[in-house]
Amino acid sequence: MARVTVEDCVLKVPNRFELVLIAGQRARDISAGAKLTVERDNDKNPVVALREIADDTVPLDALQNALIQNLQKHVEVDEPEEDEMEGFIADRDLAFENVANEDEMIEDGMSINDTGADFDVDSGDE
């Protein structure tokens, strides 16, 4: 039965590889609880998906779009404007200058240790 179904589906989706991807997407949709457009007839989800594609009861465009969205790993985001980038680069350059200054201080034997404790000056009147 599946062979006949695949042969019918190839008429709708000529590329067999694309057919496998689309049918797999529809089978995952069915597993997730999507409503069936054909009777199950005790068939498993991939066979039901192929039957739906062969009978043209599901929109192929919607399945292709869902497939593309599920396979996308990189989502494009808006890039920051030039002014923001210039400010970021300037901040980064200042940070590198500070690191260089700290390295020079360490080479000279100087260090800054911030313990967070305040020094109290005793007046000696205890």
From Swiss-Prot:
It catalyses: RNA(n) + a ribonucleoside 5'-triphosphate = RNA(n+1) + diphosphate. GO terms for cellular component: DNA-directed RNA polymerase complex. Keywords: DNA-directed RNA polymerase, Nucleotidyltransferase, Transcription, Transferase. One of its GO terms (biological process) is DNA-templated transcription. The keyword rRNA processing does not apply. SUPFAM superfamilies: RPB6/omega subunit-like. Signal peptide: none annotated. InterPro entries: DNA-dir_RNA_pol_omega (IPR003716), Pol_omega/Rpo6/RPB6 (IPR006110), RPB6/omega-like_sf (IPR036161). GO terms for molecular function: DNA binding; DNA-directed RNA polymerase activity. It comes from the Bacteria. Its EC number is 2.7.7.6. It is an enzyme of class 2 (transferase). The RNAP catalytic core consists of 2 alpha, 1 beta, 1 beta' and 1 omega subunit. When a sigma factor is associated with the core the holoenzyme is formed, which can initiate transcription. Belongs to the RNA polymerase subunit omega family. Promotes RNA polymerase assembly. Latches the N- and C-terminal regions of the beta' subunit thereby facilitating its interaction with the beta and alpha subunits. PANTHER family: DNA-DIRECTED RNA POLYMERASE SUBUNIT OMEGA (PTHR34476:SF1). This is DNA-directed RNA polymerase subunit omega. It comes from Paramagnetospirillum magneticum (strain ATCC 700264 / AMB-1).
